[in-house]
Amino acid sequence: MAVVIRLQGLPIVAGTMDIRHFFSGLTIPDGGVHIVGGELGEAFIVFATDEDARLGMMRTGGTIKGSKVTLLLSSKTEMQNMIELSRRRFETANLDIPPANASRSGPPPSSGMSGRVNLPTTVSNFNNPSPSVVTATTSVHESNKNIQTFSTASIGTAPPNMGASFGSPTFSSTVPSTASPMNTVPPPPIPPIPAMPSLPPMPSIPPIPVPPPVPTLPPVPPVPPIPPVPSVPPMTPLPPMSGMPPLNPPPVAPLPAGMNGSGAPMNLNNNLNPMFLGPLNPVNPIQMNSQSSVKPLPINPDDLYVSVHGMPFSAMENDVRDFFHGLRVDAVHLLKDHVGRNNGNGLVKFLSPQDTFEALKRNRMLMIQRYVEVSPATERQWVAAGGHITFKQNMGPSGQSHPPPQTLPRSKSPSGQKRSRSRSPHEAGFCVYLKGLPFEAENKHVIDFFKKLDIVEDSIYIAYGPNGKATGEGFVEFRNEADYKAALCRHKQYMGNRFIQVHPITKKGMLEKIDMIRKRLQNFSYDQREMMLNPEGDVNSAKVCAHITNIPFSITKMDVLQFLEGIPVDENAVHVLVDNNGQGLGQALVQFKNEDDARKSERLHRKKLNGREAFVHVVTLEDMREIEKNPPAQGKKGLKMPVPGNPAVPGMPNAGLPGVGLPSAGLPGAGLPSTGLPGSAITSAGLPGAGMPSAGIPSAGGEEHAFLTVGSKEANNGPPFNFPGNFGGSNAFGPPIPPPGLGGGAFGDARPGMPSVGNSGLPGLGLDVPGFGGGPNNLSGPSGFGGGPQNFGNGPGSLGGPPGFGSGPPGLGSAPGHLGGPPAFGPGPGPGPGPGPIHIGGPPGFASSSGKPGPTVIKVQNMPFTVSIDEILDFFYGYQVIPGSVCLKYNEKGMPTGEAMVAFESRDEATAAVIDLNDRPIGSRKVKLVLG
């Protein structure tokens, strides 16, 4: 429904285009702007919808052409009444204007002369006599002579004392050449007119001696005697003079005030143009008032430009011209980003404001395959974008050329120049949106980031979350466009050790985002604020939240509440995670009132939720916020949950040899950074129970050893790769340790390049294992262990293996002094050569081509420098990470490098983590996972 708004305070120099620019972005139909004027400078604007009118009312107090305007709600009835009242006031004012000779000195014309006002009817049919030939239309002698003839001679010698009779409003307009002297020189007094005798019949008028000849007039009937002043009857109209030029030249100026007493058009049988302004003497025309002369309106240079947003990046200048087909496009300038590519925006210059006005009607129309926005622009924007200005002689409506507007250079002083429209309310403002700010960032850091740029005072806004911590978002407004463009060029530059994203944003969009942030803070419940502001409880570290995963993508809040039935949960505390398109991610976050309720929710782990097993994990408030900002993605295996390990064996937990650091299906204590025991590189394996460093073997070399031996700077990190199990003492092995007489020397004694027993640099790892050498005794695991296909050769001496050790040959050595293993991990001799082998129980598939190899290390790169070990463990939640194996890397100055090493219990687990979590974010950065 159309809504009418009343505007007051409109300056006299403003037009409809200025009003439309003031309400740019709102829908005003054609013919919807009505300027009434008056003392208050009123105008009425008709908006297409209620929403447009509401947005328009919000612009009250703005300026049009430097004048502050006020907006009021109105109606169509009031608008029509005001327009009609203004029209009547104008007509009444014209009727009240006195005639041109109203101020003359001298006696008024006598009543007897009133009959002469009909004399103009005698010349109404003089079809366009030339003003240079005829200077008057009739003449009546004031003497007692009889009128014998009617000729141009008598017309041209009309006595000046007849000026009073020509002063009537209906006749004075026909002789404008005498108006000026009549106003300044008073006419002589008119003598009394004696009574005229009866006039004889007038003879026929001879032809006028002016070519072409004028046909004779019919005889004039005799005038009866009229006492005291005879009245002259109207004469018969003369036939048209075909040879005379027209009397009605085209208008050259508006009618000056006072020339026509009534202000109404001249009524000479309506044969003359009512706007006839040509003087009777073209050689010496009347000097009109400069204010009333017709001059072409000066063209505001800002009315020639429009801005186009949202164009396809592949759009060229021809596409823009095709989009504005039918309009006169002067030039097109496509804007580019800092790399030199089209950014989808551009400026277009037209030849006339009418073309600009028509171009604005094409807002939100299709260009190629995208809908573009067309908005007004200024010449200042055109110049700032690199556009060129060509000065041309602008042709006005009257065909007169006038110099181009002086627009460059513009001084800062507004005096003497037309003010630019760039400061009008419809401008978007020079605002930017910052993302990725450091959490400890303050206003001074933002000012330093945009140093040497002019920032609007108190315009820096840094967003904070409900917990009082910065969210990494911010807004800045600049004073001018040059600084604004320079700020956009600092996109992805570093503030401290984090790069900042700088995005353009309109001032309206900035205010909406700030308002949304404030509403988010206001909607946060009072209880939650109290809990977070309570320093005693340290709620941030309390696990009062739950992360529910592996649920259907179409899940809703009500479904989650029904799933948590029996646990008190506020509806506003349930958040279903969605992506940027509003599609569900199959995850939900729930915040409970206390830890007891959160622990109760763990009972629902792996319960069915809409047909799928829901995984419920209890997390802290900080974890919940991090998950809400960067939801973890579900890979092929989903959000993996811990799976039960191998069944425990008495004396051998986790189906390994904890005494030698074998917590699972390999030798994690051996510090195998790659695949456990590669076939040709057995030197990369070590037994920490036998005095080998758990982080690797120095002789192995490589980056990972040096990486893992760097001391951690965090107190909770502990020694690198401190694997579970007892690495020292008499109870290190599950089975009893063989007596010292079983063999001479230790593991490392017979192996060149291996560190000697007890030389481990890690506490608790230096265990002298007496007698893993040759001898007739066995050290074996329980009989329940399945068969491993490899054998270890027996006997003291070197520890070696033939080529292809990892590929599963029948035996790993036939000479005495080798270490072998039985096929069934049980007592009894194996098929491998060598008498009296010593059997060491190993996990299934150890150093074989089948089953799971040993622990595998993953290198994590490109992490935030402030990342903690807990955050890394949360990132790998659901994968079998060896506890205590996370090691952060620091440089020589002790600063974090954003890299870490994480050990997994098997290579399959590490491979799955790399496939599922590579390029996933930790904080605001995507991490890279490299399999060791």
Swiss-Prot record:
Positions of region (Disordered): 97-116, 393-424, 717-853
GO MF entry, a single one: RNA binding
Recorded GO CC terms: nucleoplasm; ribonucleoprotein complex
Cited Pfam families: RRM_1
Disulfide cysteine pairs (residue numbers): none
BP-aspect Gene Ontology terms: regulation of RNA splicing
Protein name: RNA-binding protein 12
Gene: RBM12
